Amino acid sequence: MNLVSAAEAVKLIKSGDSVYIQGSTSVPEVLVQAMTDRAAELRDVKVYTAFAIGRCDAPYAKAELRDSFEPLSFFVANNLRKAINEGVAQTIPAFLGEIPFLFRSGQIPLDVTLLNVSEPDEDGYCSYGVSADLAFSAVECSKVIIAQVNKYMPRTFGDPVIHVSKIDAMVRGDEPLVEVPTVIPNDVERRIGNFIASEIPDGATLQIGVGGIPNAVLDALHDHKHLGLHTEAMTDGVVPLIQKGIIDNSLKKIYPGQSVACLCLGSQRLYDYLDGNRDVVIRDVAWTNDPQNIRQNPKVMAVNSAIEVDLTGQICADSIGERIFSGVGGQHDFMYGGALSEGGKCFIALPSITTKGISKIVPTLTKGAGVVTTRFQAQYIATEHGIVYLRNKSLAERAKLLISIADPSVREELERAAVERFGIGFLRVK
């Protein structure tokens, strides 16, 4: 293994290049800082990333470096959120599962990919570890590969491997992965989790996200049997279910006996569980999020969250009004794939009201809010006040159902808005 310094490695980046930085908790921070240190020598470098969870704000995303770097994110996480909402960086709306197509088709050409990889095995293969998602296709489409070799990166199996002969420069950078603390569900989240868990049958295949409500759902599944996992992000919450044999993947049609994800984020406990574990398969996001793959599994239960839902079932999950908070991610991919699965169900979960007392069920979405899941795709909506099924319901019927799970303090106001919008059609709904 021939190693060079980070400063030497990033000299392969030229002005005008397009650079992809591996995301999730796999950000190669040694390489990112070395690239940023070359700002005075570089101009017009496009820097792409997605769901990059760093220890601090991205160092290249600063107003004073705008002539050197143009930061672009497909899904906003903590290290670019401030820069994007200040206009220093930009977000590209895209379904996560379709971004590899943008790379492979040349619509977004890439010159350089920066990776954070495991040490090579005896055959010279390094693992991308906890993040194959976009990295797999980015490597495939880039002219130059620069890798930070990290003894803390777990070795995972599936798509995320690269031979040292394919890497143009390798740098030693032993950094523990960023840990994402497990969110302990509060009482509201537990009530929502219980409503959703009651709809999940034995033998279901789970897609479940990150946060208090997903963890509450997982906590409520400990009496279930023969569950499977085919998800975008694998977190700590699924590990106890796997270890107890509740998630055994025995009834899945694709990768039976193995859990499937495209990225993993959580505590060191999760990373230790993944290291060398062939019971977990990490795949390219173009594969994990393909609805035609998702639908092959039985009883797909897609559990996702939202920022607000309007009375017709339009779901905003990426922004708070005009302020970008996250991105589309794989919500659409799994809502669609889950709907096509035999016995599948798709859930959107959210508290009925914010901590500031603002209703999350609204007459119309806030000005500037993005529609991540359309009202044509909406199925189950759950709050702490219940769960309702919107599919095949008229707009007036949907409004009636959604008002029934809104916070009691706003139901009268929502009813007035519904009458004004739907008129006699709303009044006729039983």
Placement of each model-derived feature along the sequence:
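Conserved alpha/beta enzyme-core scaffold
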Residues: M1-K430
